[in-house]
């Protein structure tokens, strides 16, 4: 019997953060580093908990080199060879603690993951990524990976509801990726009608995860630094970015020049372009659930990173949070019908 949930579910665009009295004198006083101890791996983390998405146009070794300078994290896409991993590890040993090796559920993916982690023991994070984290097959896969790598920290997803967050944590995952369909080049919601507004998903999933001493990543839906701050305010331990980090020198994707302007290709990993590149095309039984866009070339990613971090620091000063850790406790969301004056501005 179909059921309608009448509870209002909200996205980042539906809210603003209410300002509160603050004792902070300057944005420079804000500490954006977080330290976590993970439930299943028993490992610890310290850094600025923003992650470059495991897309081949974002989660690149070139991106990782820059992000690790700021103590940010990179989920490296799964299409690098073992030789490429070894070459990067040899040249950039200081970056390895800020990286995850990614894998799908396929046997070839898992075999390569094993080879990478055996060859480069300094990599302690695994990102298990599927479009639909609700399948029993994926739960069993997480259990198998935990059994094989008992001391590695496992990120797993994607899901959007508390009960599945709990099941994945109890199956061996440490950090759950939250988000179905909010990404800028994801078309899952249009193709399938399935999804969940990201702000509400983060709030509900964070509550479920934290009750089990687990953690979550808000994956997708951010279009500006304010959205990243809202995700942290909603309870996300980490925020994963794709579109905001696309189009840079360090991003993957072909560089195109047209009419004197430069663009970089950016596409979803379930797009027709990605499937042609890695699977020989879209299988007869499925549809593409991603799109390809041309992002105006933005130059070095360092400027974008500073803009994002500066925005979050400013958020913290507005709500009186001296540390990023305090942001969710200082957050009160107010529902709005408009966020910005649109006369001279873009969407965000």
Curated annotation (Swiss-Prot):
Residue numbers binding GMP: 219-221, 242-243, 268-270, 286-290
Entry keyword annotation includes NADP: yes
Keywords assigned: Acetylation, Metal-binding, NADP, Oxidoreductase, Potassium, Purine metabolism
Cellular component terms (Gene Ontology): cytosol; GMP reductase complex
Residue numbers bearing the N6-acetyllysine modification: 291
GO biological process, one term: purine nucleobase metabolic process
Binding positions for K(+) per the UniProt entry: 181, 183, 186, 189
NCBIfam families (UniProt xref): GMP_reduct_1 (TIGR01305), PRK05096.1 (NF003470)
Role noted for this protein: Catalyzes the irreversible NADPH-dependent deamination of GMP to IMP. It functions in the conversion of nucleobase, nucleoside and nucleotide derivatives of G to A nucleotides, and in maintaining the intracellular balance of A and G nucleotides. Plays a role in modulating cellular differentiation.
Protein name stated in the entry: GMP reductase 2
The organism of origin for this protein: Homo sapiens
């Amino acid at each position: 019997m179909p059921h309608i949930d009448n509870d209002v579910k909200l996205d980042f665009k539906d809210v603003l953060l209410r300002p509160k009295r603050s004792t902070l004198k300057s944005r420079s006083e804000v500490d954006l580093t977080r330290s976590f101890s993970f439930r299943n791996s028993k490992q610890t983390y310290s850094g600025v908990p923003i992650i470059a998405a495991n897309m081949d146009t974002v989660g690149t070794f070139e991106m990782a080199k820059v992000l690790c300078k700021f103590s940010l994290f990179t989920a490296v896409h799964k299409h690098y060879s073992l030789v490429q991993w070894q070459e990067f590890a040899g040249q950039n040993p200081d970056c390895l603690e800020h990286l995850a090796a990614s894998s799908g559920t396929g046997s070839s993916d898992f075999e390569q993951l094993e080879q990478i982690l055996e060859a480069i023991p300094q990599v302690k994070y695994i990102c298990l990524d599927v479009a639909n984290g609700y399948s029993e097959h994926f739960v069993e896969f997480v259990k198998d990976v935990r059994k094989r790598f008992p001391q590695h920290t496992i990120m797993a997803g994607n899901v959007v509801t508390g009960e599945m967050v709990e099941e994945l944590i109890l199956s061996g995952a440490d950090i759950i990726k939250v988000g179905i369909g909010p990404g800028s080049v994801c078309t899952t919601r249009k193709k399938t009608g399935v999804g969940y507004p990201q702000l509400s998903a983060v709030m509900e999933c964070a509550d479920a995860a934290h009750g089990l001493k687990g953690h979550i990543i808000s994956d997708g839906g951010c279009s500006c630094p304010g959205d990243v701050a809202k995700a942290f305010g909603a309870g996300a331990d980490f925020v994963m970015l794709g579109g905001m980090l696309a189009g840079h020198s360090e991003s993957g994707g072909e560089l195109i020049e047209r009419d004197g302007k430069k663009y970089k290709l950016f596409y979803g990993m379930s797009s027709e372009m990605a499937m042609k590149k890695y699977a020989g095309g879209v299988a007869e039984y499925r549809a593409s659930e991603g799109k390809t866009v041309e992002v105006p070339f933005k130059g070095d990613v360092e400027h974008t990173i500073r803009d994002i971090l500066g925005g979050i620091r400013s958020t913290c000063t507005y709500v009186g949070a001296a540390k990023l850790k305090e942001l969710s406790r200082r957050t009160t969301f107010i529902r709005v019908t408009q966020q910005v004056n649109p006369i001279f501005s873009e969407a965000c």
